[in-house]
Amino acid sequence: MKRKNLLYTLVFGSLIIFSNMIIAQENTSIQNEKAVYELINRVLPHDATQFKVAFIPKENEKDLFEIESVNGKIMLRGNNGISIASGLNYYLKNFAHCQITWNGTNLNLPNPLPMVSKKIQRKSPYKYRYYLNYCTFNYTMSWWNWERWQKEIDWMALNGINMPLAVTGQNSVWKRVYNNLGFTDKELESFFSGPAYFNWFWMGNLDGWGGPLPKSFMDGHEAMQKKILNQERLLGMAAILPAFTGHVPPTFKDKFPDTKLKQTSWVGFPNVNILDPNEPIFTEIGKRFIEEEIRTYGTNHLYSADTFNENTPPTNDSVYLNNVSQKVYQSMALADPQATWIMQGWLFYHSDKFWKTKEIKALLNAVPNDKMIVLDLWSERFPVWKRTQAYYGKPWIWNMLHNFGQNINLSGLMSSVANNPAEALHNPQSRKMLGIGLTMEGIEQNPVIYDLMLENVWRDTPIDLDSWLKDYALRRYGKKNTNADKVWQILSRTVYADTITNGGAESIITARPTFQENPGGTSTTKLPYNPLELVKAWNLIMAASNDLKNSDGFQFDVVDITRQVMANYATIVQQQIAIDYKNKDSKAFKKNSAQFIVLISDLDNLLSTRKDFLLGNWLNDAKKWGNTPEEKELYEKNARNLITLWGDRDNRLHEYACKQWSGMLNGFYKIRWEKFFDQVNRDMVQNKEFDQKLFDEVMKDWEWNWVNATETYTTEIKGDAVKSAMRMHSKYYKTILKAYK
């Protein structure tokens, strides 16, 4: 009788569990469908009712979407929210000739909406479509709120991203872990960095810079991360959470005196402590962190950890390197047996003199092949997979890096992006290439190169660049224009054919003032193309102005191209000033230096016409996170510091994240150049040799004062973008043309 009751209990209990699973799945499906409809409504608030959605299964384990017209509506089908959103974007681009980008959007849909006469189906050949770089979370996203994040997640879904890095909100998790290990909040103040420097703190490059970090910021980011992850997962994304790589607080030895630590330094910042992976507490801390992270955020079983980020290991001993990887992975797997380690392959490029075959194999082979995925971080330019036999059998992802420091310049490598993902996919030597992705340090710039890269998501063949660019211009501007087509042809073979610079050339305007044409440091002013060709494109886009002036995308492009032409021309003027100084021609020096200052002012006025180029937005968004005057001041200082000195007054990364923004030009760069010209002029009058080193020291003090200042910059655009660009063209075109000829 007992056995019969037990059997009844087991069967009935199983039925309850099974029915609960079905209900849970149905609820999840309902939530997913709701999330997709909400996305459509956010993107197309006036036309959302014209679209219907339905979920269908994968085909041969491949994500897919279908589009067709049913009863006068556009039916979007897909295996998850991402696929359906991608179907929507495909329809918008290819049927409605519309476009959604960070910098200019065209959603002027035809009325009535075009019908899809024959069902369209697209499958992605890539299991993973990765997005983001640790650096993006600071160079672009330091001050984002939930509204901005939601907009980005929509954009990710529309473009097929299914594997985003999600490292927001980890400091509160670390705080709880270290509190439980006996560290006080006061001790952690010297550990956690300020908000603009999280990336480099997380990767073990620095401690405490820009802090102390208020608890309110940690709590706010934890709440926001929950929203981010919920939205990403509802749409079908598998988010990558951070893991432990050994970076521990400065007072770690006080709590654990017998543990072995090594100290590393990075670009002049004070040493940080890295816990020896052989110490038993290494895996214990890593396990505790993952456990607390899962409790807080849930998991998709994907974890990011980067060992030796821009730091050389203390030894190339294979046993040591193997052991490091083993312990990092173990710390994940002890907390989550399903853990897969997502590793950025940046170290193999950045420190390629150290990372040879033996060393790379030692690091990678410690982890089972099915438990690690390597991000080939700069595939469009320096594909490490080609010199590592595709990471010796590890699954890996082809990525476009493109941008450094969210610098503002026209640059990219279109031919590589259009051809190489598909070529790698079909190359037997690529072995376990499982996806493609974007790993830029900063976004909200050069939208064309990202649109091009993401065109690869739903195709397995190279992109015909000439044809694609014509379609791009049509989508962007809303109508065909011959001059616009010619502009993009010129851009594709000049600024977007850059095989020389790393992330594009900077303008001499943003350099610390000097007579040198190319001051060096963290960037170059050397152009990888003939600037006269860009002037031709400038003339052509101005010729299209009357026809396309109402297009948001055109307004951005005409300002951006004008900006680049003027930024390039600044070097011509600066070098003439250098000649004037060498010739001791005081009159010419005054005339040309005045012209240089006017050029900066004109550039600032031009950029003030677009929200994309306002310093005020960056600073104001930072201050919005503050709950007290002290917090607002701290966040503003972080925001100012990152885009100027980067660290203290002597930091060699100064100007790494320079910005050609309205407000920065007049409020920072112009003032530096005015001080430079004033000092040189005084020296010329007194017949003295200009002392560059002394001037630099004076400038560092002024720059540090600017970092700590609080003057306000506008968040409101002023003037008409196209008219402003036309004025610049009228004023400078003939002069610039003559200078290059």
Which residue stretches match the model-derived regions?
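Catalytic and substrate-binding clefts that recognize carbohydrates or anionic sugar/phosphate headgroups
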Residues: I120-Q121, W144-E147
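Histidine-centered catalytic/metal-binding microenvironments
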Residues: G520-K741
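Second-shell loop/turn segments in exported
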Residues: E26, G72-G78, F137-W143, K215, ...
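Acidic/histidine-rich, surface-exposed loop or edge segments in extracytoplasmic proteins
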Residues: E68-K73, N133-F137, G208-W209, G553-D557, ...
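Bacterial Sec-dependent N-terminal signal peptides
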Residues: M1-S29
